[in-house]
């Protein structure tokens, strides 16, 4: 192994934490030895390259129940585990993207006086960023407005880094349904969304009659495949690595509103129907969705208000055909596309790379 400095990346759980960290890591791996810290039995092992030396902790997010004290005790024990890892691997810098693995990592790093950078991708900062952000050397923000929630932190707006595929044009995979009908990408994030899946199943007859083409990503949350006798216009998958190609080439995305998804839609200039996860902490998914809804590039439907009728009426409105100068077009969809083009893009991973490499001068 070359005599590079050692960077510990602490990111685990959902794609919203893992994918931004992966995007940054690939930008800086030429100057740093990468060590990755994740959580046992999560998505980490499926996505983290073996060369990044994945280590895992057996830790769970605290819940409001009788086992709360026990769970915080496990976080404390995890802090000692992280201290041991930091010493063993001779870590020079820690980069984390939030989530419950971040708390013991930040505490351990500060006890050893190792600099820490945390990236907060949501508009409303998560619990770890709120409570431990002041211990970090930098808190990097996915949205400028997040700064107002973190008055005691050293914040810098960088945007949220995306997977490399989103920064280049991709061809539509050949397994996607072919035809002239509008292409819908329906997904619920890396873990899936039962509510979105259910409303889609209830509306499939309507969608097939309207000749929509559908790619349905059901997610990894142990949901069973539905045995559906549908036309060739419907494809169902648990997960795909070609999500950038799907979003870039579809007509409309129907999804949750995690920060990663919001930024992928902005980069791809793609209109959407967003159905925020109602139990997200601080209602951050709804706040994320409002960014695109306020810009006119998305329609926000709260899960408590969604129904087969509302879903179908919304699609009919978006895809209502208007005639202009003898040509047919989708007036509302075209307006949503134009509004998405006006959202500012930022090459976030390049900005974050600057801050990580800044610490090279300190060693």
Curated annotation (Swiss-Prot):
Pathway: Cell wall biogenesis; peptidoglycan biosynthesis
GO cellular component, one term: plasma membrane
Bilayer disposition of the protein: Peripheral membrane protein
GO molecular function, one term: undecaprenyldiphospho-muramoylpentapeptide beta-N-acetylglucosaminyltransferase activity
Reactions mediated catalytically: di-trans,octa-cis-undecaprenyl diphospho-N-acetyl-alpha-D-muramoyl-L-alanyl-D-glutamyl-meso-2,6-diaminopimeloyl-D-alanyl-D-alanine + UDP-N-acetyl-alpha-D-glucosamine = di-trans,octa-cis-undecaprenyl diphospho-[N-acetyl-alpha-D-glucosaminyl-(1->4)]-N-acetyl-alpha-D-muramoyl-L-alanyl-D-glutamyl-meso-2,6-diaminopimeloyl-D-alanyl-D-alanine + UDP + H(+)
GO biological process, one term: cell division
Entry annotated with the keyword Cell membrane: yes
Record keyword Cell wall biogenesis/degradation present: yes
Enzyme Commission numbers on file: 2.4.1.227
Main location: membrane
Keywords: Cell cycle, Cell division, Cell inner membrane, Cell membrane, Cell shape, Cell wall biogenesis/degradation, Glycosyltransferase, Membrane, Peptidoglycan synthesis, Transferase
SUPFAM superfamilies: UDP-Glycosyltransferase/glycogen phosphorylase
Pfam families xrefs: Glyco_tran_28_C, Glyco_transf_28
InterPro entries assigned: GlcNAc_MurG, Glyco_trans_28_C, GlycoTrans_28_N
Localization, UniProt: Cell inner membrane
Root EC class: transferase
Binding site for UDP-N-acetyl-alpha-D-glucosamine: 14-16, 122, 163, 190, 285
Record-stated family: Belongs to the glycosyltransferase 28 family. MurG subfamily.
Annotated function: Cell wall formation. Catalyzes the transfer of a GlcNAc subunit on undecaprenyl-pyrophosphoryl-MurNAc-pentapeptide (lipid intermediate I) to form undecaprenyl-pyrophosphoryl-MurNAc-(pentapeptide)GlcNAc (lipid intermediate II).
Record-given protein name: UDP-N-acetylglucosamine--N-acetylmuramyl-(pentapeptide) pyrophosphoryl-undecaprenol N-acetylglucosamine transferase
The organism of origin for this protein: Prochlorococcus marinus (strain MIT 9301)
Lineage start: Bacteria, Bacillati, Cyanobacteriota, Cyanophyceae, Synechococcales
Gene: murG
């Amino acid at each position: 192994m070359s005599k590079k400095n050692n960077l510990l990346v602490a990111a685990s759980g959902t794609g919203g934490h893992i994918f931004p960290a992966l995007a940054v890591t690939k930008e800086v791996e030429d100057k740093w030895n990468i060590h990755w810290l994740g959580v046992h039995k999560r998505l980490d092992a499926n996505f983290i390259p073996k060369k990044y030396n994945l280590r895992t902790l057996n830790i769970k997010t605290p819940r409001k129940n009788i086992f709360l004290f026990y769970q915080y005790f496990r976080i404390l024990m995890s802090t000692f585990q992280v201290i041991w890892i930091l010493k063993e691997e001779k870590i020079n810098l820690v980069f984390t993207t939030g989530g419950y693995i971040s708390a013991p990592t930040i505490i351990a790093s500060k006890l050893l006086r190792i600099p820490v950078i945390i990236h907060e991708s949501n508009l409303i900062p998560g619990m770890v960023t709120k409570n431990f952000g002041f211990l970090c050397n930098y808190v990097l923000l996915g949205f400028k407005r997040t700064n107002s929630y973190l008055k005691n932190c050293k914040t810098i707006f960088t945007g949220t880094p995306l997977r490399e595929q989103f920064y280049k044009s991709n061809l539509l995979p050949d397994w996607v349904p072919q035809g002239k009908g509008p292409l819908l990408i329906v997904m619920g994030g890396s873990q899936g969304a039962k509510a979105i899946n259910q409303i889609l199943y209830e509306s499939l007859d309507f969608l097939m009659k309207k000749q929509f083409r559908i790619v349905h990503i059901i997610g990894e949350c142990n949901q069973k495949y539905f045995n559906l006798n549908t036309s060739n216009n419907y494809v169902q998958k648990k997960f795909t690595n070609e999500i950038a190609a799907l979003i870039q080439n579809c007509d409309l995305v129907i999804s949750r509103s995690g920060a990663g998804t919001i930024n992928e839609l902005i980069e791809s200039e793609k209109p959407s129907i967003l159905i925020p996860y109602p139990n997200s902490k601080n209602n951050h998914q709804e706040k994320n969705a409002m960014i695109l809804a306020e810009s006119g590039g998305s329609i926000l439907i709260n899960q408590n208000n969604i129904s087969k009728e509302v879903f179908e009426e919304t699609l009919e409105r978006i895809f209502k055909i208007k005639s202009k100068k003898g040509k047919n077009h989708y007036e509302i969809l075209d307006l949503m596309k134009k509004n998405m083009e006006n959202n500012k893009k930022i090459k976030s991973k390049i900005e974050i790379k600057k801050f990580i490499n800044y610490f090279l001068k300190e060693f």
